Amino acid sequence: MTAPAQVPDSDEGFIRFEGIHKSFGPKVVFDDLNLSIRKGETLTVIGGSGAGKSVLLKCLIGLMDPDRGRIFFDGQETTGFDEKQFLPVRRRVAMVFQGSALFDSLSVGENIQYPLREQEPDMSEEERAKKVARVLSLVNLPGIEGMRPSDLSGGMRRRVGLARAIASDPEVILWDEPTTGLDPISTRIIDELIRSMRAKLHVTSIVVTHDMQSAFTVSDRIAMLANKHIVQVGTVAEMRASPLKEVRAFLDARKGEARVE
């Protein structure tokens, strides 16, 4: 059966992927992938396991290179940048990892300060402490600077990971499966935080998730990755009403995954 045509996305976005091809040996992950992300929006990328959602994030920040195609960040092409050239881009981007990626040997406060010491070496200890307190308040975890990650629940660890990410004042936040493995209450808290980051900090967010309830809650637009490219980009209402078989099959398969609270 013929695959649906690649979705054109000519909108001059803040972040753009144009004609991206990526393979790992014989496995083709992207074949002429195009996607545009608008400044200040929350765009969620959905798709089956192994579709390449996380690979897309890694290509954006230079952890992987596309085989062909072009990537633009705020009007500047970053394709082919070396590590030194990517540094200014990475300082504008923060990633919230599925596993939080906290150092168990450090306190919560020390974990949040860790990237600040490298990125802002001239910042005083008092300024760092104030920033840590501010970002912990933003994720509704005030006063836990002295706790260890091992003392925290999974949801709290995820929120500390977010606090560390926003401590560097990013313009873009990348969320890699932010609700995976969390209980329904923690999931709802993370969803609310994703929404509040846009409202309070005016960041651009790219969310990778299998959790369609979360995607419907947090997204301005949703992009469906299937058949090695983006088959549809649309609002929540447009995706719910999509006639495309790839989108319908993906959504129908997840109808039974409703959260129990």
Where are the predicted features?
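A short, proline-enriched helix->beta-strand linker immediately N-terminal to the Walker B motif
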Residues: 167-171
